[in-house]
Amino acid sequence: MSKEVLATAKEKMTKAEESLRRELGQIRAGRANASLLDRIQVEYYGAPTPVNQLASINIPEARVLMITPFDKNSIADIEKAIQMSDIGISPTNDGNVIRLVIPQLTEERRKELAKDVKKEAENSKVAVRNVRRDAMDELKKAQKNGDITEDELRSFEKDVQKLTDDSIKNIDAITAEKEQELLEV
């Protein structure tokens, strides 16, 4: 039973790290990244559809995203969805492709985004700590019920703490990498 608690805790901590990676991928760092378009839904034949299912997305230059629709009739819908989104970039449509030129970030905006990165990282750390607390509570309950001995409890608690420390270290590394990316000009 205790092994399952450890496995579940590890899985949940990994999910928190992956979630942070996804969230940080959405933060624009002054260079083109296809994940900027992940949350944009296009109204296509009455159904909301992700941009990446309607078009191929290429990065011909460091600060340019090029969107080539599979169906030329959807180009206006894609352009409209991008304009309505919160990414803050105006699309350029030449009839065949849509280009998004990512503007250079100002120093002030970089610092603002770095704060957002830290906030997201802290949220992930809180999630990891909550997983640790839940796992510890479950282990203590198992010990109380007589499923594991006190020595086993201490051993499993150390394992949970090691998982937590590793996960927090990974979150710090992910955060540092994104901050570095944001602050380089």
From Swiss-Prot:
Q: Name one GO molecular function term.
A: ribosomal large subunit binding
* Compartmental location: Cytoplasm
Name any GO cellular component annotation.
cytoplasm
Q: Which GO terms describe its biological process?
A: translational termination
Gene3D superfamilies in alphabetical order: 3.30.1360.40, Ribosome-recycling factor
Keywords (A to Z) from UniProt? Cytoplasm, Protein biosynthesis
Q: Which Pfam families match?
A: RRF
| Database matches in NCBIfam families | frr
Q: What does this protein do?
A: Responsible for the release of ribosomes from messenger RNA at the termination of protein biosynthesis. May increase the efficiency of translation by recycling ribosomes from one round of translation to another.
PANTHER family given for it?
MITOCHONDRIAL RIBOSOME RECYCLING FACTOR PSEUDO 1, RIBOSOME RECYCLING FACTOR
The family this protein is said to belong to: Belongs to the RRF family.
What HAMAP family does the entry give? Answer: RRF
Q: What is this protein called?
A: Ribosome-recycling factor
Species in which this protein is naturally found: Enterococcus faecalis (strain ATCC 700802 / V583)
Give the gene that encodes this protein: frr
